[in-house]
């Protein structure tokens, strides 16, 4: 009987390990600026909300920042990063609704407007994976909107 329970526990832990993976997110292009880097791994129901399935806040070094989310259950997720330059804890927008803070999402460089979950989602399976994103900083200006630049 004890052997049965021990075997059940072992098989149960193997099954849960097989359905979860570590997700490493490489954030490229982080600039040397003040403010915390807020990152979040989110399900569809958590998308663009304050907290996700897993969240990490850190003071970033410039260059590439790596964030590891351990034992992520298989499924569809979005990742977003906010370099909170003004320290207010949320995305700051200019009068023309352009982000004043740095930000990154999977596929973010292709976005033409506000993202949807389907625009930026990726799939986590049972294998560990690395996702790469690039920080975007607008500084309140869009170069193509100002021909003098």
Predicted regions and their residues:
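Extracellular beta-sheet/turn segments enriched in Thr/Pro/Gly and aliphatic residues
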Residues: 101-139
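A glycine-anchored, Pro-Gly-centered beta-turn/N-cap motif
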Residues: 63, 68, 73-76
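A short, amphipathic beta-strand motif
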Residues: 23-29, 39, 133
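Acidic, glycine-anchored loop motifs typical of Ca2+
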Residues: 85-92
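Sec/Tat signal peptide C-region and signal peptidase I cleavage site
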Residues: 14-20
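Sec-dependent N-terminal signal peptides
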Residues: 4-14
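Short, ordered, surface-exposed loop/turn motifs in non-cytosolic proteins
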Residues: 32-49
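A short tyrosine-centered beta-strand micro-motif
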Residues: 77-81
